[in-house]
A protein has these predicted regions:
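FAD/FMN-dependent oxidoreductases across multiple families
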Residues: 310-312, 325-444
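Extreme N-terminal leader/targeting segments of oxidoreductases
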Residues: 5, 9-102, 121, 561-574
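Predominantly flavin-linked oxidoreductase catalytic cores and closely associated redox partners
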Residues: 207-346, 405
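Glycine-rich FAD pyrophosphate-binding loop
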Residues: 104, 108, 117-138
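N-terminal FAD cofactor-binding segment of flavoenzymes
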Residues: 132-173
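Short beta-strand to alpha-helix junction loop
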Residues: 140-141, 182-204, 252, 269, ...
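N-terminal Rossmann-fold NAD(P) dinucleotide-binding loop
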Residues: 111-112
């Protein structure tokens, strides 16, 4: 079976911290002094202007705080007694209020795109953002196809799209220690300025009549029969027909829904943006240069990615990340960051004392098999990372949500216009997607299991074989996969190619994955085939019939057709 890796999309939400500096001082970083180094960077930043979503905090203390959350997550020290009830359902009708919004979007950093799309269609929309509604300094890396989704839904013009691109580069490398090296073009090859992008969308949102409430967090949501009432932490009350939760993995509503659940998978990532790279015209989508590594009392496989940064021709962002389960003896972010200082220079072919550290980045991304998250309450829907729509390999953020903006904006308009805002109808907007669910086996194959002791080179060999076969099969197989799209025919071709060319490697794969995960993957793979047939053979004949149905039935069938399309990967258009 084919066990693959998708490049981590470099636009994480909520659990990321970055530290900024505009100092010209060169830092010689060692693991013993990283506390002092990071605090110097914060001090040099002069004021630490925070941005919503990724990059909200900025100190060594923030790293320790995030590590404490990671410790609690893998130790399961939380209890049901300590659960904070943010969202509650009330049976009685609310009192009439003067102003009722069609939608209140909680979490503006990524929520502003959907909010703007709805406002442009005539909906009365408000955005609630705990901090200031502005983008971070660090670029988001996406493909042009993904970015054009914002033009498709009217959020950006063609000219504005070009203006928000901070840097463009080609080609990109995929490579594994001692094995295959593949070069591709036009995949995650744009660095988009979140500052410009969010400022542009915010201006268009306000121009369409939208309301922005900054510096206010969500304290409570009470759902009544005819509306939802949002209480903000400054005492402000908003009444809305629909609440969109775009607050990412750290959403308090998501924490309530998933309370007591241990994540099925976690990605830990550390990195920097630094100045001083002479050869800086290409990127790495995913790269390894070491076998399985002992980190503390646990073993893990380190992966790398790197991109030119838009802040200068010699500026480069490098990330080191790993996939883990959430068991107690897994390494901390601080341990990984110490390894990063040692491993990044030979990876990039530089000396640490020759580069200027501009930003330090680190993040924690938990994912769950029960995703996308179905609506748990009437009038509340999780969107983006909050819903778990991201792949457990690519880990979401900006590029993950753009793929679904067209589907979500049209679906939400249908729901609002037909007043289909109960949890059963809203759940149709976060449907089962077999191509997403099947990726869990890939995540397992790329992480070192505690109860299995594979060869230190197993993961590198596995990925090398997969990409070697994909390269031979050509663009129709490798390009969709590298853009976070799983399709049945390319996957079937790859499976056959591996079985024919590397039959002796199959038993090792089965040992690494395990019988039950393999059985689970088989179920999703069969569903992927079924969804492909339904979309290609059945859906075209249903389109005119669906349009003849009453609005309520149209809503249900449109969501079903979208589930077949997106669940089979046929939303991908090259």
């Amino acid at each position: 079976m084919n066990l693959l890796v998708k490049p981590m999309v470099c636009c994480p939400q909520r659990f990321v911290v970055h530290l900024c500096t505009h100092s010209t001082k060169t830092y010689h970083v060692t693991s013993k002094h990283q506390n002092k180094i990071m605090e110097k960077l914060v001090g040099a930043a002069g004021g630490n202007q925070a941005a919503g979503g990724a990059g909200g905090a900025s100190s060594y203390e923030a790293l320790k705080k995030l590590d404490q959350q990671w410790l609690q997550m893998r130790s399961m020290t939380t209890t049901t007694q300590g659960m904070m009830m943010i969202a509650t359902r009330k049976n009685k009708r609310r009192q009439e209020e003067e102003q009722v919004f069609d939608a209140v979007v909680c979490g503006g950093t990524l929520g502003v795109f959907l909010a703007t799309a709805l406002a442009l269609k005539g909906m009365k929309v408000a955005i609630v953002e705990r901090g200031p509604l502005r983008g971070r300094v660090q670029e988001w890396n996406v493909s042009r196809k993904e970015l054009r989704e914002l033009v498709k839904i009217g959020v950006l013009t063609d000219a504005e799209l070009e203006d928000v691109i901070a840097v463009e580069f080609n080609p990109s490398r995929v490579g594994f220690d001692g094995g295959t090296e593949v070069w591709v073009k036009d995949i995650l090859n744009l660095g988009v300025s979140p500052e410009k992008l969010i400022a542009t969308c915010k201006k268009r949102f306000l121009g369409a009549g939208g309301v922005v409430l900054e510096g206010m967090g969500v304290s409570k949501v009470n759902v009544f029969d005819d509306a939802a009432v949002v209480l903000l932490d400054d005492g402000t009350t908003l009444v809305s027909r629909l609440i969109l939760d775009v607050m990412g993995n750290s959403s308090p509503i998501v924490r309530q829904i998933r309370w007591g659940q241990r994540p099925d998978g976690v990605c830990l990532v550390v990195g920097t943006c630094a100045r001083g790279f002479e050869n800086n015209s290409t990127s790495d989508l995913i790269y390894t240069r070491t076998p399985v590594t002992q980190v503390g009392s646990s073993k893990t496989q380190y992966f790398w990615e790197a991109f030119p940064a838009g802040s200068g021709p010699r500026d480069r962002t490098t990330y080191m990340f790993t996939y883990l389960d959430a068991t107690p003896n897994r390494p901390s972010l601080e341990q990984m960051l110490e390894d990063y200082w040692d491993l990044m220079p030979p990876y990039q072919g530089i000396k640490l004392e020759d580069v200027e550290i501009l930003r330090v980045l680190f993040g924690l991304f938990p994912t769950y098999r029960s995703s996308p998250l179905p609506a748990a309450f009437d009038r509340i829907l999780q969107v983006g990372d909050a819903s778990g729509i991201q792949s457990p390999i690519s880990f979401g953020g900006f590029a993950a949500i753009t793929r679904h903006l067209s589907r979500l904006s049209s679906g939400l308009m249908d729901a609002l216009e037909s007043d289909l805002l109960d949890k059963e109808n809203l759940a149709l907007l976060n449907p089962y997607l077999p191509n997403l669910s099947g990726v869990w086996m890939y995540q397992r194959a790329m992480s070192v299991q505690l109860d299995i002791n594979p060869s230190p080179d197993f993961i590198n060999n596995l990925l090398s074989i997969n990409f070697q076969c994909m390269e031979k099969l050509g663009d129709p197989v490798i390009r969709p996969f590298l853009q976070d799209v799983i399709q049945f025919v390319p996957q079937a071709k790859l499976l056959i190619s591996i079985m024919v060319n590397k039959p002796l490697f199959i038993p090792q794969i089965l040992q690494q994955v395990g019988f039950l995960p393999l059985l689970d993957w088989t179920r999703h793979f069969i569903a992927l085939a079924a969804y492909s047939v339904l979309w290609l053979a059945i859906a075209p004949s249903l389109l005119s019939w669906v349009e003849s149905l009453p609005k309520e039935k149209q809503y249900v069938w449109r969501r079903q057709l979208e589930a077949w399309q997106y669940g089979s990967g046929f939303d991908y258009n090259g």
